[in-house]
Curated annotation (Swiss-Prot):
The gene is truA. Its EC number is 5.4.99.12. Substrate binds at Y109. Formation of pseudouridine at positions 38, 39 and 40 in the anticodon stem and loop of transfer RNAs. One of its GO terms (biological process) is tRNA pseudouridine synthesis. This is tRNA pseudouridine synthase A. The lineage of its organism: Bacteria, Bacillati, Bacillota, Bacilli, Bacillales. Belongs to the tRNA pseudouridine synthase TruA family. It comes from the Bacteria.
Length: 267
């Protein structure tokens, strides 16, 4: 039986999702619980492997089990054993050929930034502090250039190991908030550090150090050295996982060009 789990977590005190030899991770927390319940190792498979310090409002993983436990009991058992910075929102049974990673057709991230005269220690780990006044209109102009299908080689970590760096973004915009602004970006998939590089560049645009019209040339150049910035992990939230094309159509309309994954290229 294949079990699908919807979770949220506050990532400040985790070394990321993926299990590490030493240190606290999301995968380690769940596999420890599942091993105790099954009396043997159980591997979980996430929709996204978030990095150290990154949060998730919505994240999914699946695992296989021989235990005959109702969905609500799975949720209750895991929440009872989990620490306070992780929560299981929902548990459901899925077909045995469903795969959390390869059936995922889209992801949405939100990067939160606050602006004030002084740093707020109570927001440490939850939002990124930018003291300068920024030109939100110019940032939005630049953000729009990222929408569509592009090679994002120049906007990801040089450690990115996947062969194809072509991704499709359905949404890329700045949203003003009471304390600052958020960057919302939705796409078929994202490269290593891609969202953090995108927002770091947009902040430079907001400061007047870069221009919106540079984006097409930078995408064409595919040179990471021309965009040598990466924003901190603390402001980044995995906000939504799209597991079906209908979910994307509901949010972005019938004309959206949906990329079916079923491969390791669109991480």
């Amino acid at each position: 039986m294949r079990v699908l789990v919807n979770i949220s977590y506050q990532g400040s005190q985790f070394l990321g999702f993926q299990i590490q030899q030493h240190g606290r991770t999301i995968q380690q927390q769940f596999e420890k619980i599942l091993k105790r319940m099954h009396k043997h190792e159980v591997r979980i498979h996430p929709s996204s492997r978030t990095d150290r310090g990154v949060h998730a409002i919505e994240q999914y993983f699946h695992f296989d089990t021989e235990l005959n436990i109702p969905e609500q009991q799975w949720q209750y058992a895991m929440n009872r054993a989990l620490p306070d910075d992780i929560y299981v929102n929902d548990v459901s049974f899925v077909n045995d050929d469903f795969h959390c990673r390869y059936d995922c057709v889209g992801k949405s991230y939100r990067y939160k930034i606050y602006q004030s005269a002084h740093k707020d220690p109570f927001l440490c780990g939850l939002k990124t502090y930018v003291p300068e006044q920024l030109d939100i209109e110019k940032m939005n102009m630049a953000a729009q250039h990222f929408i569509g299908t592009h090679d994002f080689t120049g906007f990801c970590s040089q450690k990115t190991e996947v062969e194809s760096k072509i991704r499709t973004l359905y949404e890329s915009r700045i949203e003003k908030t009471e304390s600052g602004f958020d960057y919302i970006v939705t796409g078929s998939g994202f490269l290593y550090n891609m969202v953090r590089v995108l927002i770091a560049f947009l902040i430079e645009v907001g400061k007047g150090k870069r221009e919106p019209q540079e984006v097409p040339q930078l995408l064409e150049a595919r040179d990471r050295n021309q965009v040598p910035f990466t924003a901190p992990a603390e402001g980044l939230y995995l906000e939504k996982i799209y597991l079906t094309p209908n979910e994307l159509i509901q949010d972005f309309g019938n004309n959206i060009k949906i990329h079916q994954k079923k491969s390791s290229q669109n991480l």
